[in-house]
Amino acid sequence: MRQEEVVIRGGSVVTSYGIVEADVWISGGNIRRIAKDSLPKEAKGTARPNEIDASGMYLLPGFVAMPERPHGRIRRLPEYLDAIRLLIRQGYTCLVDTLQPEAWMDHPQVRYQTAMHFNNLIDYTWQVELPASRLNGETVRRWCGEGYRLLRVVVRRPEELFRMDWETISPLLTSYKVMLQLRVPKEAGLNGEERLRLHRQWLSLCRCWQIRTWVDGEASLTFEEFDPYYHVFRLRGEDCERALRHLAGHWFRSLPVIAALDEVQVNLRRREWDPESLLCLLVRVASTNAAKAAGLYPRKGCIIPGADADILFLKKEHWLTKFVLSTILNLSDFLLPTSVMSKGKWLYRNQCFASTIGMGRCLLDIKPYNYVI
């Protein structure tokens, strides 16, 4: 059955580089047109589209969730739905979850590990977590052949990097265009200097073999000294604020950084933060850049024709009051969008969640090499 056409009128569309007043046409779960109509149009013989009044609201693209705790491992359905609804409440409309297969698992057993996401309310994709000792040609060929394009490599000691068979796996990774993510667990027991040295060695190897990768950003890492295409940095806390200040001072400069919205830390009392500019920067780092790194752009992370209609409705008064000097609100209070829409359907509205269990799609046709961040 064809989905009803929807027009969102009167809203302010937030992009990575600015805010524009425009109406948004949605059909079949996708954005079809963005423009500002001065006169209403009526076509004979066609049904009038359903109009949504977004006056006094910002329209933001949905954010990309990258939780540390795999949601697919939750085995009780009520607990799982509560976790997904919390993500929606925070403004996330897409999830990058982690699959942690054991070496003995075959295809049906791996599929069982992903079964809980059949109840997902939002679209999701997978990154496969593997220890460095298991990252060989056979393993890479298996997971790439099954459609996975994000591999997270767990490294505990620096010497594990040089035991990896880079000559064998690099042609496979570049052929399938697979993004690698480095994870150094806290229980590895590395101090700050050892962790930083390991990160630098990893980045150097990935640049040498022309493999795109993302790592956790460290305060000691200087982004300018690394490759702007092959190296992507995931930032948290104060490191994220440092990057946002840099972008605010160099508005059109490219910087390969991503962040999860709930991990952004910004001191709103600093005078250099313009409310709407900061909102654009949050969209750039936590939505557009995150979608590019995960290979989901331009389907996710933007409000443009052809993209999925994943839209957050945020009242301007709720955002702008954070910058009044008398308030003590933190950035975390932003995690309260008025309404959330996914693929043109309401997920959250009037403080109520829609009964859309199972609406989320598994997105494996991702392309993490397509865009510079």
Regions found by a protein language model. Name each.
Residues 65-78, 125-136, 155-156:
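Active-site mouth loops of central-metabolism enzymes
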Residues 109-115, 134-257:
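Histidine/acidic residue-rich metal-binding segments in metalloenzymes
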Residues 1-22, 26-27, 35-37, 84-90, ...:
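Active-site microenvironment of metallo-dependent hydrolases
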Residues 39, 69, 99-101, 129, ...:
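Short, ordered loop/turn segments at secondary-structure junctions
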Residues 39-113:
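Metal-associated gating/positioning segment near the N- to mid-region
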